[in-house]
Amino acid sequence: LLAFLMVLLALVTILGNVLVILAFIMDREISDRSNYYFLNLAISDFAVGAFCMPLYIPYALTGTWHLGRGLCKLWLVMDYLLCTASVFSIVLISYDRFLSVTKAVSYRAQQGITSNPVINMVAIWVLAFLLYCPAILFWEHVAGCSMVAVDQCHTEFFYNWYFLLCASTLEFFVPLLSVTYFNVHIFHSIQRHQRQGSVQDCDPQKNSRLSWRFCLLPRPGASSPPSEAEDSVSSLTRSWRPEATANCPSPTQTSPTALKRDISVSFRSSTGSKLQQDKRRAKSLAIIVCVFAICWAPYTLLMIIRGACRGKCIHNSLYEITFWLLWINSALNPFLYPVCH
């Protein structure tokens, strides 16, 4: 039964993230800047299900590593790299949402620049590699010997409390504080915009100044003296602040007051729609962050405690449960993406 559940989790992780990747490739409408970061998260989660889980299942069931030291090193590098990249991707998604709400104008101006998200994603993978992988590869060479048994597969710093505390701070605690900060500011910004919108709706005299475009067309067979035309333009400028243009189409019979009211209603409707969209995305992002915290906090705390007492105070089965909880997060993420759109 345990083996079946492990295999099922791996399959769900693979299929769920494959669907996300295919949706991004086939549907160009969702290929915007923010969704690049979801794609990055889906790629790392897919690799967890396709590579890390299948190699670990026999080891978890038998307690013995049969695949050799070289493949053990590769598995450790990939596992730590992919899980850390997944965490950093969640931070980047939160930061992107933070910018889209708090700095909407500059964010939209850079929406079509694909180089920015690509650079950010590359930076994520580089930082994730530098955090654990050099220690995995070179720890035994620096120490002069290996502390891991031949039939086991875990890192050399498995019981080094100081290293685990420092690495966990960068991998979990700093990202958790960062995404919490971003989400709190997102909700505060949305609430502030809602209050401002309510005030504007109640006081129509304080609506934003609008710029009106008009043209003066001479009547057939008649001409206005220059002074009369100038007086007309001056009068309109004082009352409506228009922008004079040439080569305009024929004027319509629409009342300026009615036109102003229509544009004002349209503007408020558009702003309200954007606000509701931001609010919905903020709530869904908060769900992703909460799931991340629930899945990662037990493992991180137990790993530090286990390192401090050298594995004597934490039962191995409890540690295994928290370890699989990390991978459950990779399986859940694809099902949380749709609520963000």
Feature roles, as predicted:
Residues 60, 64-81, 103, 109-184, ...:
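Loop architecture of class A 7-transmembrane GPCRs
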Residues 4, 8-11, 40-43, 47, ...:
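Hydrophobic residues within alpha-helical transmembrane segments
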Residues 1-7, 23, 29-117, 157-160:
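Extracellular TM2-ECL1-early TM3 structural module of rhodopsin-like
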Residues 185-273:
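Intrinsically disordered, low-complexity cytoplasmic regulatory segments of eukaryotic proteins
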Residues 174, 178-182, 283, 289-304, ...:
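Seventh transmembrane helix
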Residues 1-15, 19, 272:
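Extracellular N-terminal segment of 7TM GPCRs
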Residues 12, 82-89, 177-181, 285:
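Residue-level signal for the membrane-embedded core of alpha-helical transmembrane segments
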